[in-house]
Amino acid sequence: MAAIPPDTWQPPNVYLETSMGVIVLELYWKHAPKTCKNFAELARRGYYNGTKFHRIIKDFMIQGGDPTGTGRGGASIYGKQFEDELHPDLKFTGAGILAMANAGPDTNGSQFFVTLAPTQWLDGKHTIFGRVCQGIGMVNRVGMVETNSQDRPVDDVKILKAYPSG
């Protein structure tokens, strides 16, 4: 396994070049340092390159980060899963919030989602670790693609390349 970067490595943004355009994500290092490090380092390693947004629910969220494309895969830089970093100041108040997808408490891996609307019922259940700072219109367009009964896009929406700034 590749080395985990030092705590001093804190790129402010991660860029997602997708098949529908570019999304720039601002990372909340102060509130969720372990989660930000995982996401930025996975991006730096090319882990997300070629992966799909495998789950899209209109007016709710777009989800990606699973190299298997099934919604059941993905690992963190720390091993399989790591603990939540829930911060009381961060709430799901609107569109463009970046958070970790999970299967319950302390089950974070590589999957993440971006909200398309307020989703207050997720407060305290998913680690918020950033926001869309450029490309929210593109995120909204991804959120409107046609999906099947399992919320999978009929036509793939891919992350062509993901990389941290700096």
Curated annotation (Swiss-Prot):
Disulfide feature: none
Alphabetic keyword roster: Isomerase, mRNA processing, mRNA splicing, Nucleus, Phosphoprotein, Rotamase, Spliceosome
Q: Which GO terms describe its cellular component?
A: nucleus; U2-type catalytic step 2 spliceosome
Q: Does the keyword Transcription apply?
A: no
Phosphoserine, modified sites = 149
Recorded hits in Pfam families, A to Z, give: Pro_isomerase
- Per UniProt, cyclosporin A binds at 54-65, 70-71, 99-104, 109-113, 119, 125
Q: Taking every annotated instance into account, which residue ranges of this chain make up the domain PPIase cyclophilin-type?
A: 10-164
What did gene disruption experiments reveal?
Mutant mice, in which PPIL1 is truncated at position 102, die before 12.5 dpc.
Q: What top-level branch of life does the organism fall under?
A: Eukaryota
- How is this chain's activity regulated? Inhibited by Cyclosporin A.
| Database matches in Gene3D superfamilies | Cyclophilin-like (2.40.100.10)
Which terms in the Gene Ontology molecular function aspect does this entry carry?
A: disordered domain specific binding; peptidyl-prolyl cis-trans isomerase activity
Q: GO biological process: what's one of them?
A: protein peptidyl-prolyl isomerization
What broad class of enzyme is this? isomerase
User: What's the catalysed reaction?
Assistant: [protein]-peptidylproline (omega=180) = [protein]-peptidylproline (omega=0)
Where is this protein found?
Nucleus
Is the keyword Phosphoprotein assigned to this protein? yes
Q: What are the EC numbers?
A: 5.2.1.8
How does this polypeptide assemble, per the annotation? Identified in the spliceosome C complex. Interacts with SNW1/SKIP. Interacts with CDC40/PRP17; this interaction leads to CDC40 isomerization. Interacts with RBM22.
Its biological purpose is as follows:
Involved in pre-mRNA splicing as component of the spliceosome. PPIases accelerate the folding of proteins. It catalyzes the cis-trans isomerization of proline imidic peptide bonds in oligopeptides. Catalyzes prolyl peptide bond isomerization in CDC40/PRP17. Plays an important role in embryonic brain development; this function is independent of its isomerase activity.
Write out the similarity annotation: Belongs to the cyclophilin-type PPIase family. PPIL1 subfamily.
> What's this protein's name?
Peptidyl-prolyl cis-trans isomerase-like 1
Organism from which the protein derives: Mus musculus
